[in-house]
């Protein structure tokens, strides 16, 4: 995998962010990454095929929600919280609170 393109902060569009967050699996990934940590793709557990999870990760990255980096053969992902907060103040906390209250995306976990 070559280095993926990430949109600059001012290129992050609200419509793309909201569309990306409308899927329960993608919202679950965001909930998992909300602790501020970075996770290897191999650590993510979701009720979808690996190829489908890879697609979800691309949608999140292309929307500007996550940042992916490659180290050797491993890929790591983290939430672009500061960029999202700069662009859309209070959006992410509101979405995370609502998702937590409704338990949306809870099936996405990290490997122990």
Give the residues covered by each predicted segment:
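N-terminal helix-turn-helix DNA-binding core of bacterial DNA-binding proteins
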Residues: 12-49, 71-83
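Conserved acidic functional residues
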Residues: 23, 56, 89
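Short beta-strand His + acidic residue motifs that chelate non-heme Fe in jelly-roll/DSBH
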Residues: 67-69
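Secondary-structure transition/capping residues
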Residues: 40-41, 55, 95, 106
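Canonical helix-turn-helix DNA-binding module
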Residues: 41-65
């Amino acid at each position: 995998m070559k280095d993926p393109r990430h949109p600059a902060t001012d290129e992050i569009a609200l419509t793309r962010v909201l569309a990306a967050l409308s899927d329960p699996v993608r919202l679950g990934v965001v909930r998992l990454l909300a602790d501020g940590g970075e996770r290897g793709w191999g650590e993510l557990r979701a009720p979808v095929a690996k190829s489908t999870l890879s697609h979800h990760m691309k949608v999140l990255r292309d929307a500007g929600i996550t940042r992916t980096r490659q180290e050797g053969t491993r890929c790591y992902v983290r939430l672009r919280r500061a960029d999202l907060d700069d662009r859309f103040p209070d959006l992410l906390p509101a979405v995370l609170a609502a998702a937590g209250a409704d338990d949306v995306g809870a099936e996405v976990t990290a490997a122990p």
